[in-house]
């Protein structure tokens, strides 16, 4: 996984927030999935990034496993 890449997650693919989330992922905790909606969701840590590329804030969210990189 490239630490420089920004991933965009639809509102339905992460918990919790409103609207799409642009995140530079720093860590995916694949050892501790949480089962919800008949899918595995994973704790993810990273930096939220604006549409213009500015860093906004650190975030910890659950992301639908099927939407995560590698």
Residue ranges and their predicted role:
Residues 1-26:
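Short coil-to-beta transition motif at edge beta-strands of beta-rich domains
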Residues 29-36, 51-53:
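Short, conserved beta-turn/loop elements at beta-strand boundaries and strand-helix junctions
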Residues 38-45:
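Short aromatic-glycine-enriched beta-strand elements
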Residues 45-70:
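Intrinsically disordered, low-complexity, charged/polar segments
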